[in-house]
Amino acid sequence: ARKTRLADGRRVIDQPFVRRNLAKCQAGGEALKLMLWKQAWTLTHSRLHPAEASTAKVYASEFFVEAYRSMMEIFGAAGKLRARSPGAILAGRVERMYRSALILTFGGGTNEVQRDIIAMAGLQMPNYKA
């Protein structure tokens, strides 16, 4: 983004939406790292609570979906191209990782179920009954 220029000569990195997306990815990644370090510590001390594990799963899966979506927005149409497509940026890895990240929102338990675990086990809220 620093070296890439738009048709009018401006650098991509100077665009407000690019800076905002990169900042959100950086901040979200740092928050996730701290969350996982805490989870690793509590696990090694046999203190891991189901609500903490569910919180990390929900946050991580949704963070990666949003981060890859943000990267595809920055790359424009070329970021949405699959591997071996002419003009694909980063050999189509961003598009592939975006699709893979979507699976994380339901693999290992849907995020809706994980939110129920957080509510019941972490917040002592009653079980939701439709």
Task: Label each region the model flagged.
Residues A1-A130:
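Alpha-helical interface subdomain recognition
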